[in-house]
Curated annotation (Swiss-Prot):
Keyword Protein biosynthesis part of the UniProt annotation: yes
Reactions catalysed, as given in the entry: L-methionyl-tRNA(fMet) + (6R)-10-formyltetrahydrofolate = N-formyl-L-methionyl-tRNA(fMet) + (6S)-5,6,7,8-tetrahydrofolate + H(+)
Listed name of the protein: Methionyl-tRNA formyltransferase
Pfam family membership, one: Formyl_trans_C
UniProt binding sites for (6S)-5,6,7,8-tetrahydrofolate: 109-112
Originating species: Kineococcus radiotolerans (strain ATCC BAA-149 / DSM 14245 / SRS30216)
Keyword tags: Protein biosynthesis, Transferase
């Protein structure tokens, strides 16, 4: 089949590679426009755009995928289907109606759980033992379409959102190809989502990524892992903001937010137990071990994170 892949971040690259290796023909790639990034605010292409250029594929980068210029280009490409992986913008009805088999979205949750932009992050922060991914038929509602295929993936006790996304992206790419094969063969069967079990996964805000030291050690661990690598869990010390890396819950009793520096570890108190702090990254600087940070900063007895 003729395909136009819609995707933007690194997590969508495995799907593009899998489609290029399949018997289907990727005739173009739809991705978000180049965006300013870094200290110099230079225009940077998305990971999918870079991979598409390497493969010599035509790129579509509209500000919104509903303009007449984009719709005309899509109609001219005449795709049979448009697979989607983390594209980053809503697709309007006019575009949904162009391919004869519609748009097939690889979503990183077991729908109807965690509909929205941050399903993996929300699953980790919620303490889910299992998550997964599914391929569903895109429609105008938010992740509401019928599901063609799905698979489960356990959430390990130290898994970050980034760890899970990497695994789901690779396995999901293969499932996406299988669904497209079934559609082409006429054997595909999509099942409507159940009305029960719906949960929403809006994008994680910067404020949500702030560590609440009045939470339990387990809750803080989940929040840090769910916000890794993006947007990054953070806290403040002496009025300065910085990111904190992996933490390990331990039973040691330390007052909430209090910093306890030991010879080989740095503890931070919580509402229940404490956490061993792994890394610290001050604004504009590289990440460093918590012990190195403590040696340089020298927290005084009784000082706290806030």
């Amino acid at each position: 089949m003729r395909l136009v892949l819609a995707g933007t971040p690194e997590v969508a690259v495995p799907a593009l590679d899998a489609l290029l290796a399949s018997r289907h023909e990727v005739v173009a790639v739809l991705t978000r426009p180049d965006a300013a990034a870094g200290r110099g605010r230079k225009q940077v292409a998305s990971p999918v755009a870079l991979r598409a250029r390497e493969a010599g594929l035509p790129l579509l980068q509209p500000e919104k995928p509903g303009g007449e210029e984009f719709l005309a280009a899509l109609r001219e490409l005449a795709p049979d289907a448009c697979p989607v992986v983390a594209y980053g913008a809503l697709v309007p009805r006019a575009a949904l109606e162009v391919p004869r088999f519609g748009w097939l979205n690889l979503h990183f949750s077991l729908l109807p759980a965690w509909r929205g932009a941050a399903p993996v992050q929300r699953a980790v922060m919620n303490g889910d033992d299992v998550t997964g991914a599914c391929v569903f038929q895109l429609e105008e509602g938010l992740d509401t379409g019928p599901v063609h295929a799905s698979f489960a993936e356990p959430v390990g006790p130290t898994d970050t959102a980034g760890d899970l996304l990497s695994r789901l992206a690779v396995r999901g790419a293969g499932v996406l190809v299988e669904v497209l094969d079934a559609i082409e063969a006429g054997t595909a069967h999509a099942v409507p989502q159940p009305a029960e079990g719906v949960s929403l996964a809006p994008k994680i805000t910067v404020e949500e990524a702030r560590v609440d030291w009045a939470a339990t050690a387990t809750e803080i661990d989940r929040r840090v892992r769910g916000c890794t690598p993006e947007p990054g869990a953070w806290t403040t010390f002496r009025g300065e903001r910085f990111k904190v890396g992996p933490v390990v819950p331990v039973p040691d009793p330390v007052p909430a937010g209090r910093i306890a520096v030991e010879r080989k570890r740095v503890l931070v108190g919580t509402a229940q137990g404490s956490v061993v702090l792994g890394t610290v990254q001050p604004a504009g600087k590289k990440a460093m071990s918590a012990t190195d940070w403590a040696r340089g900063t020298r927290p005084q007895p009784g000082e706290e994170f806030s």
